[in-house]
């Protein structure tokens, strides 16, 4: 059984996500994330909790094919967009370069 995510885990992901947005390279949106997965540029995929199941399974399939890590964000697409500092919803995002953040190292564990 997977360990439960606590509130501090969600807050730490949010803080690391803000650092990635500021210092790294990210791609927001479903179509752009699929493009990054197909080209092999994506290092980590974040999928919000209310992403439609068909899109979620397609993203998981492409990430499995490209050997990219997937993180299921516990919040909705509105919360993921807000965590990125955007004023719009974002159901999926791909991290191309983590910058100064250690979000990729945490996902390896």
From Swiss-Prot:
Component of the ribosome, a large ribonucleoprotein complex responsible for the synthesis of proteins in the cell. The small ribosomal subunit (SSU) binds messenger RNAs (mRNAs) and translates the encoded message by selecting cognate aminoacyl-transfer RNA (tRNA) molecules. The large subunit (LSU) contains the ribosomal catalytic site termed the peptidyl transferase center (PTC), which catalyzes the formation of peptide bonds, thereby polymerizing the amino acids delivered by tRNAs into a polypeptide chain. Belongs to the eukaryotic ribosomal protein eL30 family. It comes from Neurospora crassa (strain ATCC 24698 / 74-OR23-1A / CBS 708.71 / DSM 1257 / FGSC 987). One of its GO terms (cellular component) is cytosolic large ribosomal subunit. SUPFAM superfamilies: L30e-like. HAMAP family: Ribosomal_eL30. This is Large ribosomal subunit protein eL30. It comes from the Eukaryota. It is found in: Cytoplasm. GO terms for biological process: negative regulation of mRNA splicing, via spliceosome; rRNA processing. InterPro entries: Ribosomal_eL30 (IPR000231), Ribosomal_eL30-like (IPR039109), Ribosomal_eL30-like_sf (IPR029064), Ribosomal_eL30_CS (IPR022991), Ribosomal_eL8/eL30/eS12/Gad45 (IPR004038). The keyword Ribonucleoprotein applies. Keywords: Cytoplasm, Ribonucleoprotein, Ribosomal protein. PROSITE patterns: RIBOSOMAL_L30E_1, RIBOSOMAL_L30E_2.
């Amino acid at each position: 059984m997977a360990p439960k995510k606590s509130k501090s885990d969600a807050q730490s992901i949010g803080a690391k996500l803000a650092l990635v947005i500021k210092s790294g390279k990210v791609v927001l949106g479903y179509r752009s994330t699929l493009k990054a997965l197909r080209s092999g540029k994506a290092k980590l995929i974040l999928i919000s909790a209310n992403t439609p199941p068909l899109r979620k399974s397609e993203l998981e399939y492409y990430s499995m094919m490209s050997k990219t890590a997937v993180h299921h964000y516990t919040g909705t697409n509105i919360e993921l967009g807000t965590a990125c500092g955007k004023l719009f919803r974002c159901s999926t995002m791909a991290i191309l370069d983590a910058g100064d953040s250690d979000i990729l190292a945490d996902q390896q564990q």
